[in-house]
Structures are given as C-alpha cells and as structure tokens.
Amino acid sequence: MNFFCFAIVFLLLVNNYRLQNYEIIINYFVPLHKIMTIIAVVLGYFALLFAFSRWTGRRATNETFYRADRQSPWYMVAFGMVGASISGITFVSVPGMVLTSQMNYLQTCMGFILGYVVVAFVLLPLYYKLNLTSIYAYLGQRLGQRSHKTGSWFFLLSKMTGAAVRFYVVCIILQRFVFEPLGVPFALTTVLLVLLIWLYTRKGGIKTLVWTDSLQTLCLFTALLIIIYKVATDLNMTMGEAISAVSGHELSRVFVWDDWVSKQNFWKQFLSGVFIVLVMTGVDQDMMQKNLTCKTLRGAQKDMCTYGVAFLPANLLFLSLGVLLVMWYQQHGLTLPASGDELLPGYVEQTSSIFHLTSCLFVLGIVAASFSSADSALTSLTTIYCVDILGQKDNEQLRKRTHLGMCAVFVLFILFFKVVNSTSLIDAIYIICGYTYGPLLGLFAYGLLTKRVVNDRLVPYIAVASPLLCYAIDYGVGQMTGYRFGYELLMLNGLITFAGLYLSSKGQDD
C-alpha cells in the first residue's frame, strides 16, 4: 500500500511538472519518452523492494529492526553485503580510475581481503561473545562511559557524512537523466528518494535490508555485466576479444613496485586497504550490524570471508569496464572526460539516444548500489542513537521517530554536500573517512591491544584533537615536501589517537 500511494503521488508530481513545462515536452519528445521508460523501470524495481518490505515487516519488533532476530542466513548476508559495500560511488568513479591510476586500485582490494580475515577472526568473536546490538557498547565496557559516547558520536558524524556523499551520487544521476528535464528541483528529488528508503525500511529495519540488499546486489551486477557486454559489442568485439584487449591495454597495469613516493605504491595501497576494512567495516556499526544478524559466529565468519574475497573480482569488472570505455571513446574520436567520474555517464549520454537500454541499466545500477548503502546507513544511525546515545533500546515509538528524524537530517546533509563538494567523489569518501574514522580505529585498537585503564574523562578531547593534529601534519608535510598523505591518513589518525590514549593512562593497569 505504501508503494502504490507513493507511486500515485509521484506520477501526479511528474504530470504537474509536465504541464508546467509543456514547451519542453513538445521540443524533446524522444528524451521524455526515454525518461518515462527509466521511471517505469525504477518504479518496477521499487515495487519488488516494497514486496520484500511487506514480507519481512510482519510482526516486526525492535529486536527485528536492530538484529533481525538473529535469524539471517549467512549466504544472504554475504551476497547482500557485496552490493551494500560497493555503493553508487564505485559504479560511477571506479571505472574512471583507469584514467589517472590504471588498475592500481586492485592493490587496495587485495588489502581488503586480509582486512576482512582479521575482522572475521578477531573482532567478530568478541562481538558475538558480548552479544552486542551496538558494537560501541564494547567501548563502554572496556574503556568507560565517555569513551562509549565518544565512539557513538564519531560514528554518527562519520556515517551521516559518508552516506550523504554516497547517496549524493544517485541523486545527481537521477536529477541529470530524469528529473531535470521535467523541471523538478534537486531538493525535491532528494526528498522523494529518501522518502522511499524510509517507507520500505521503517518496519523491518535490518531484517528487511538483508533481503533487499541481495536483490539490489543482483540488479547491480546484472546491470554492470550487460553494460560491459554492450560496450564490447559497440567495439565489435566478442567477450573473449574484449578480455584480451583489456588485459593487453596500457591502462591495465595493476602493480607499482618501483616508486616509493607515489601514492600508488603497492605497500601503501595494500596496507591502506587492510586498515580501510578494519575501520570502515570492523568498527563500523553499519557494516557490522548485518553480520551480527547471522545465527552463529561461524556463519558470520563465513559470510565475511566470502564477500571479502568477492571484492577483488567485483572491482576488476568495474576497472575493466573503464578500460573498455576508454577504447570506445578513442574509437569514436571523442575527447576523454577531464574527470574520471564522467567516463561512464558520458558514454551513457552518447549512446542512450539510440539505445534506451543503456540509460535504463545505468540508472538501475546506480539506484541499486546507492540505495543498498543508504538504507543500511540510516538503520544503523537509528540504532546507535536509540541504543547508545539515549540508552532506550526497547522504546518502539522513540525508534520510529528517530528513524524519521535521521532521514530528515540525511536530506540536509546531501543538500549541503551538493553545495560544498569539489573533489572526486571516491577520494572525498576516504578523506572524510581518514579524519572521522581515525579516532574509532584508535579507540578499538587501544581496547584490544592493551590492558591499561584509559583516562575516560580525557577521551573526548583526545578524539577531537587527533583529527586536527592529523590535518596539521598533512598540511605541514605538504608545504615542506610537496607530499600529501593518501589513504594512509587512516593509519596516522588512528596512531595519534592510540598514542594520546596511552599517554593519558600512563602508570595505570588493569
């Protein structure tokens, strides 16, 4: 019922804008026909999401919303987590990475695998042993109440900001390909999309997401594979010929061993990949919440190792698409985009006037990737605020109000980011991650690697000072040597936090 009500309102809005933009319809009938085809595909996709929501939301309680009653099949969690972790940023930005760094990103993906193994066999056993709903409750038990609150607030800031960056992708893509020609303002586009998320997650929460993420992952990779096939066909290649062309292309270089200064050096990329997973998965409530819904610890470990390994071939597909797109641009005598983020959208714009399928698949892939990230982020933010900040895990009415409030704040963050963003989307995510996730890494590392009692009163100040000091070091080194920290910013930030905690607890032991 929710879906059909929304569909009626949506179509009325579209009809209203069509009436207001009568001249646009007359002059651009074919583009609008394409737009309506995209809208039909997206509405059909959301009809499936709402069907899953209706099924999983029956007799849902707070325990269902937060932990899916600890009954999720591990293989469904693993499959869904691939799509949830990839996001719309990957769909747009990773193919374009070949323009500036070839296939060097696969070095980071190799580090991801080791990172997931560490999380599966070090952190997951701890979380299951303590039977946690929120992983930041560990900080309260090990370090103290202020440490608990500090970790929770840093996650709220980090996740809200990072998720807004990711969801910004789907908003600008749909605005560009669908809503802008109809005269719909960006703000309304954003509100409509976030409203959809709220509607299909408001009852079942994380239980709904385990199943909808699997559907979204399936749609994402179906769209990706068909687009790859479409580009190869445009190049008059069979799939075998396309594979050979990609593997022999100058942009297919993976490893950088010889340049220690370069940000693309193998060991910098590999170690950054390990720490990115430790932070963005191991101490991230959003990523861990689904893993904590598995029936057993062994099931959770199997799911994490499975999707950890899957990241390498998944990103290889995206990068291979990037190489094929470069070949397509060159074959058609077109200038390559100045920004890698425009590589795939540019291809879609060039071909979608002839093939509606291209634009439909592109939008479907973007929507599937971005919604699987945003919906789980909003669920985890609601969980943290209710369970950790307010300490009212069982208050169902509070949880419902908080979920709606988080959606409203999410919209504001997206609109703010649209105004201030001026960097590559994929780099923006890791810049934000480096400055806001670093203290989380330091807090968990201190709790796990030492037995010393922290000075809990000073923890909030240390956590705030660490990113500021990290930024000062990055700026100072850049001014003096020209070197800028890359993904290793995570490690530096975590190390500064760890050192601050250690010095503040000098002479105190458990």
Give a label for each model feature.
Residues 20-35:
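Short, Lys/Arg-enriched N-terminal segments with co-localized hydrophobic residues
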Residues 31-510:
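Membrane-embedded helix-loop-helix hairpins and adjacent transmembrane boundary segments
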